[in-house]
Design a protein with these regions (language model features):
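Active-site region of glycoside hydrolase catalytic domains
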Residues: 216, 401, 408-415
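Short proline/glycine-enriched turn/loop motifs at strand-loop junctions of beta-rich domains
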Residues: 108-115
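Conserved aromatic beta-strand anchor motif in extracellular beta-sandwich/beta-rich domains
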Residues: 117-119
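Short alpha-helical segments and helix-capping/turn motifs at coil-helix boundaries
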Residues: 100-103, 234-236, 406-409
Length: 415
């Protein structure tokens, strides 16, 4: 037997040696390098299966999720020519912006036939001077105004028209929304204070070993029987958090919402910090103060659904109820009385990923706790599901688009 094994071994060595010899003569044989590249890019989930053999029956599903995310990443970044963070810059383009000379306003409303800005500056009437123009070949609208056309603090909305209807709407990308104390009506607000907040703590790095999180609600987390403010939280609650040894706060209900009883989870304006608690500058000061005291700040971000309100929210921005949301049976959440985002649309990904980048860069949040993840991942929204074994997580009823979105959001800073 030993002799046969030796012979077989020599024979095998000869078979391996032959292509090596040929490779020195033929440059084409260098294609073997491509095999090494492929091996190096094997998806990380292979390691998941090796670490947990119970996942082996679902390896195909895991591969599929990985491949879907890689495919979408390549599509959005032009096969790596750009970064994912470059794609997530909608907040720098859409919305109302002060320029060196004048103002510019842009909105994504492909179903609209006409858009006006109405507000304090034109007595809330349609005015040709404040009429937007559709950018040719797109669903985007644009309005350029002179320096004196708008002033800080003025209230405004869009007057949107579409085939068969019209309505007043708060712009999807607006950064400041306020509610009238008497009428209770919400409006967008021109926000361009003379003095902007400058962060004093630069390049803050959270302590993670371990991360001790204090979950809090700015409005409800204080002793007084009223809606608390960013400043009151900074002055009264943050010192107790520091004293008790926490190194992170998880802040609930920051995005603007019409109904306070929702705790902030029926969001209407995704780029506007809730004005109930104060100004954007006061929120920045709260976060900066936390950082100066070694406290990281995580934001509860709501991308699992949106409020149904049409005037305040995205429910029917320009006559198309499905502009941001799934059509048909998946349009409304069966338990939350809200609308479900269509994560399969690139424009919706653009909106949500830009929203993530906006909060990270503009307010220096250190990260997110994504709300309602189970609701996003499964067609059932997790309702009536026991999730008693791995099979329940890979039952074929998952929303691959939502999984892809969360994957991209989690990788955005590194891509």
């Amino acid at each position: 037997m030993a002799k046969k094994e030796t012979t077989a071994k020599k024979s095998a060595e000869k078979k391996v040696a032959a292509p090596k010899k040929a490779a020195t003569k033929k440059p084409a044989a260098k294609k073997v390098v491509a095999k090494r590249i492929v091996d190096q890019t094997e998806p990380e989930h292979i390691g998941l299966v090796k670490n947990d053999s119970w996942l082996e029956p679902f390896e195909g599903a895991i591969r599929g999720r990985h491949d879907h995310a890689v495919w979408k990443l390549n599509q959005l970044t032009q096969n790596g020519k750009k970064k994912l963070s470059d794609f997530a810059t909608g907040h720098l383009y859409f919305g109302l912006h002060k320029l060196a000379k004048g103002w510019v306003f842009r909105e994504w409303a492909p179903n609209a036939t006409d858009i006006y800005l109405i507000g304090d500056f034109n007595n809330w009437q349609e005015d040709e001077k404040y009429r937007c123009k559709r950018i040719e070949g797109t669903g985007n609208w644009e309005l350029k105004l002179s320096e004196k056309a708008l002033k800080h603090g003025q209230l405004y909305k869009m007057k949107v028209k579409w085939n068969g209807g019209e309505g007043e709407r708060i712009p999807a990308w607006c950064r400041r929304v306020v509610q009238d104390d008497n009428t209770k009506i919400f409006s967008a607000q021109v926000w361009n204070p003379e003095k902007t907040y400058e962060f004093q703590k630069k390049n803050f790095k959270p302590k993670k070993n371990p991360l001790l999180i204090y979950e809090c609600h700015v409005g409800m987390g204080q002793d007084a029987e009223k809606v608390g403010t960013y400043t009151e939280f900074k002055d009264n609650v943050l010192p107790r958090v520091i004293k008790d040894g926490y190194n992170c706060i998880q802040v609930m209900a920051i995005q603007e919402h019409p109904y306070y009883g929702s705790f902030g989870y029926h969001v209407s304006s995704f780029f506007a910090p809730s004005s109930r608690f104060g100004t954007p500058e006061e929120l920045k000061e709260l976060i900066d103060t936390a950082h100066k005291n070694g406290i990281a700040v995580i934001m509860d971000i709501v991308h699992s659904h949106a409020v149904k309100n049409e005037v305040e929210g995205l429910g029917n921005l320009a006559g198309d109820p499905n502009q941001f949301f799934y059509p048909g049976d998946r349009h409304e959440h069966p338990a939350w009385d809200s609308l479900c985002f269509d994560y399969g649309k690139d424009d919706v990904l653009h909106f949500l990923l830009s929203n993530c980048k906006y909060w990270l860069e503009e307010f220096k949040f250190d990260g997110f706790r994504f709300d309602g993840v189970t609701s996003m991942l499964y067609y059932s929204h997790g309702l009536g599901e026991a999730f008693g074994g791995y099979g329940d997580y890979f039952n074929g009823h998952e929303d691959d688009n939502a999984i892809c979105y969360l994957t991209l959001a989690n990788r955005m800073r590194s891509c």
